[in-house]
């Protein structure tokens, strides 16, 4: 049975982070459930693994925080939304979320955001910039902690009719199979050189 639902995800780059792999997984899950799947991104390592027969990939400089490019991206997104008759636009980062907000307002499409982490909000301008992530029709929080963080720090931007979902991160059990054993020559040391604590963590 075919579906008329077409979902466009917008993310700065498709790297190997949590937001990026989540975007990748959802993009390939949607076609298996009779939905059309689209991604707008500027690039990234995961692009080469995208199944182009299932997912329509469009390149735009949505990684940029330049206000002019954010505005121009919104114009391109309007064209994409209308041309492909997109039903839902899902933004996973702040700069592209501003482009998506304008594009969905003008095209009257549903707008979803996923709040992946605690953004730095020192100063009113920075907090306003971050607030785009709670200006959507549906806000997805990646954990109960993020849900509480949104309610505590962005209440002035939240309307009473805002809809929230808390969706916890999962793993692909087919890929991370506990029964799979690595041979000794396949085992590699794990580096912890990039391990950092969140800025809001207090010891």
Model-identified regions with their sequence ranges:
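An amphipathic, basic-hydrophobic alpha-helix
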Residues: 52-53, 63-88, 98-106, 127-134
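Conserved small/polar residues in nucleotide/adenosyl-binding loops
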Residues: 193-199
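A conserved, positively charged/aromatic
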Residues: 105, 111-142, 148, 156-158
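Acidic anion/phosphate-binding donor-loop and adjacent secondary structure
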Residues: 66-69, 148-151, 168-186
């Amino acid at each position: 049975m075919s579906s008329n639902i077409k979902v466009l995800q917008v993310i700065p780059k498709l790297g190997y982070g949590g937001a990026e792999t989540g975007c990748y997984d959802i993009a390939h899950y949607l076609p298996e459930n009779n939905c059309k799947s689209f991604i707008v991104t500027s690039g990234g390592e995961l692009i080469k693994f995208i199944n182009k027969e299932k997912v329509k990939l469009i390149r735009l400089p949505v990684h940029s925080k330049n206000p002019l490019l954010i505005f121009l991206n919104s114009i391109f997104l309007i064209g994409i939304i209308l041309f492909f008759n997109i039903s839902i636009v899902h933004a996973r980062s702040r700069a592209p979320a501003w482009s998506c907000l304008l594009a969905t307002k003008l095209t009257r499409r549903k707008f979803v955001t996923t709040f992946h982490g605690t953004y730095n909000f020192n100063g009113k301008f920075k907090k306003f910039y971050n607030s785009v992530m709670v200006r959507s029709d549906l806000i997805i929080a990646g954990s109960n902690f993020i849900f509480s963080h949104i309610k505590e720090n962005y209440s002035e931007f939240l309307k009473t009719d805002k809809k929230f979902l808390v969706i916890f991160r999962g793993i692909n059990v087919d890929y991370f199979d506990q029964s799979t054993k690595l041979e000794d020559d396949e085992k590699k040391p794990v580096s912890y050189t990039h391990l950092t604590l969140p800025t809001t963590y207090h010891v």
